[in-house]
């Protein structure tokens, strides 16, 4: 594709340049048109490799219904520009990177709100999987696809855990044992809503809502 770059759309040209190692400058990203909204922090992840900490934030826009991925890189002793708390809602703008099906974004003017909301959810697992396939068809480079699905419960068969919807459709799910025990204690085995990160093999269960309450589990590796 890189040899035929000039024949591709501007979005695909940017996407392929990014994939082969030509990152977009912050100034270039911030020159775009921002998406103003109320953003709920669905999940945060922290990884420390060779003294560099990478913080990952997944967000969802209340009005735009748009998913966003914010990456923050912190050197030793550095403080984050924005302290985004899981489950918190912030009013502000996100500047999205250019590219196909772009999720990565830079936040600006984020103000914490004393409120919350439940994102729009896929009605069941088949609808969620249809959403996953649509993302992969648009953006085959995607490694983690964010999904929101309603009315699922956690079930186990042998050593494998599954999310099962009301229709009996199930998908394998990866979940830490501590979180699994917590979810069963919180829900009593009843249905809940979930935020997942999906790939071609399985889904990772990251966040749940049960009776409108938000629950998350620390995702940190030092």
Predicted feature residues:
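Generic recognition of flexible, low-complexity loop/linker segments
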Residues: 43-48, 56
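A short catalytic or substrate-binding loop motif that flags glycine-/basic-rich loops and adjacent residues
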Residues: 49-53, 188
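Long, compositionally biased intrinsically disordered terminal regions
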Residues: 1-3, 16-19, 23-45, 61-222
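Broad gene-expression machinery/nucleic-acid interaction feature
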Residues: 54-56, 193
């Amino acid at each position: 594709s890189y040899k035929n770059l000039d024949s591709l759309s501007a979005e695909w040209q940017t996407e392929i340049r990014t994939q082969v190692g030509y990152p977009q400058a912050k100034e270039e990203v911030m020159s775009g048109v921002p998406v103003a909204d109320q953003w709920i922090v669905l999940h945060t992840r922290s990884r420390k490799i060779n003294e560099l900490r990478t913080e990952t934030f997944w967000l969802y826009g209340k009005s735009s219904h748009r998913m966003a991925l914010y990456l923050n890189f912190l050197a030793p002793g550095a403080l984050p520009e924005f302290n985004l708390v899981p489950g918190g809602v912030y009013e502000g703008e996100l500047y999205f990177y250019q590219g196909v099906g772009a999720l990565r974004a830079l936040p600006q003017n984020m103000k914490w709100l004393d409120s919350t909301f439940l994102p729009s959810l896929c009605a069941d697992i088949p609808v969620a999987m249809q959403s996953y396939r649509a993302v992969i068809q648009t953006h085959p480079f995607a490694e983690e696809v964010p999904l929101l699905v309603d009315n699922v419960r956690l079930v186990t068969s042998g050593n494998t855990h599954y999310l099962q919807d009301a229709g009996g459709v199930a998908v394998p799910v990866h979940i830490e044992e501590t979180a699994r025990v917590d979810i069963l204690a919180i829900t009593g085995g009843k249905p809940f809503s979930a935020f997942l990160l999906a790939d071609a093999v399985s889904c990772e269960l990251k966040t749940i809502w049960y009776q409108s309450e938000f629950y998350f589990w620390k995702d940190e590796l030092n």
